[in-house]
């Protein structure tokens, strides 16, 4: 039975994570994977070329070495491994799964700050630092989503937590209390 891309990503990312951790190169490999993901996004033909069964292996190896020169030996070995087993078609999923393992290991969380207006970088940083400290994260990476219907305040979505500090919700709570107290 063939493995799904998610299963492939899970297995290969765990293998890469363990390999990098054992070599004490986890941060370096993580950096390499982020660079590789960016290169793949900017050059979608790269993954098609490395996944194409018609293109000879030695041509793929030459192409791979043309952009992997700055990577750690662990990353290069892993990329050669993917090439050998024909798994480059799942590279982006593997990197995302590896990233999740890395973030979990380093106690890094990511989430969304929903606000009525666009937040600048300083505001996002202050919010993420306060939330990270309060909930025990080493680091929290927030993106901003604008939703004018919340009227004001902020709704934080981090993992399975939602902290609703919006004016809209507060007004609804006041309304419900007024109705109850009639």
Curated annotation (Swiss-Prot):
Span of the signal peptide: none
Membrane topology value: Peripheral membrane protein
Top-level taxon of the source organism: Bacteria
Subcellular location: Cell membrane
One Pfam family per UniProt: OSCP
UniProt keyword annotations, A-Z: ATP synthesis, Cell membrane, CF(1), Hydrogen ion transport, Ion transport, Membrane, Transport
GO cellular component annotations of the record: plasma membrane; proton-transporting ATP synthase complex
SUPFAM superfamilies in alphabetical order: N-terminal domain of the delta subunit of the F1F0-ATP synthase
Molecular function in Gene Ontology: proton-transporting ATP synthase activity, rotational mechanism
Nucleus as UniProt keyword: no
The keyword DNA repair appears for this protein: no
Predominant location category: membrane
Family label: Belongs to the ATPase delta chain family.
Complexes and interactors: F-type ATPases have 2 components, F(1) - the catalytic core - and F(0) - the membrane proton channel. F(1) has five subunits: alpha(3), beta(3), gamma(1), delta(1), epsilon(1). F(0) has three main subunits: a(1), b(2) and c(10-14). The alpha and beta chains form an alternating ring which encloses part of the gamma chain. F(1) is attached to F(0) by a central stalk formed by the gamma and epsilon chains, while a peripheral stalk is formed by the delta and b chains.
Record PANTHER family: ATP SYNTHASE DELTA CHAIN
Function: F(1)F(0) ATP synthase produces ATP from ADP in the presence of a proton or sodium gradient. F-type ATPases consist of two structural domains, F(1) containing the extramembraneous catalytic core and F(0) containing the membrane proton channel, linked together by a central stalk and a peripheral stalk. During catalysis, ATP synthesis in the catalytic domain of F(1) is coupled via a rotary mechanism of the central stalk subunits to proton translocation. This protein is part of the stalk that links CF(0) to CF(1). It either transmits conformational changes from CF(0) to CF(1) or is implicated in proton conduction.
NCBIfam families reported in the protein's UniProt record: ATP_synt_delta (TIGR01145), PRK05758.2-2 (NF004402), PRK05758.2-4 (NF004403)
Name listed for the protein in its UniProt record: ATP synthase subunit delta
Gene: atpH
């Amino acid at each position: 039975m063939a493995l799904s891309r998610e299963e492939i990503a899970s297995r290969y990312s765990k293998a890469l994570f363990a390999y990098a951790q054992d070599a004490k190169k986890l941060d370096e490999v993580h950096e390499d994977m982020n660079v590789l993901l960016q290169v793949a996004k900017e050059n979608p033909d790269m993954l098609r070329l490395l996944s194409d069964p018609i293109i000879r292996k030695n041509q793929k190896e030459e192409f791979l070495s043309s952009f992997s020169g700055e990577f750690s030996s662990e990353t290069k070995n892993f990329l050669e491994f993917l090439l050998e087993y024909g798994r480059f078609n799942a590279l982006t999923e593997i990197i995302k799964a590896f990233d999740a393992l890395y973030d979990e290991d380093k106690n890094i969380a990511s989430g969304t700050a929903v606000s009525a207006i666009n937040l600048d970088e300083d505001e996002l940083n202050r919010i993420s630092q306060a939330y990270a400290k309060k909930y025990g994260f080493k680091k929290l990476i927030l993106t901003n989503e604008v939703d004018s219907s919340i009227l004001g305040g902020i709704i934080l979505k981090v993992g399975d937590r939602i902290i609703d500090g919006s004016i809209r919700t507060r007004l609804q709570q006041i309304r419900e209390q007024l109705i109850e107290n009639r």
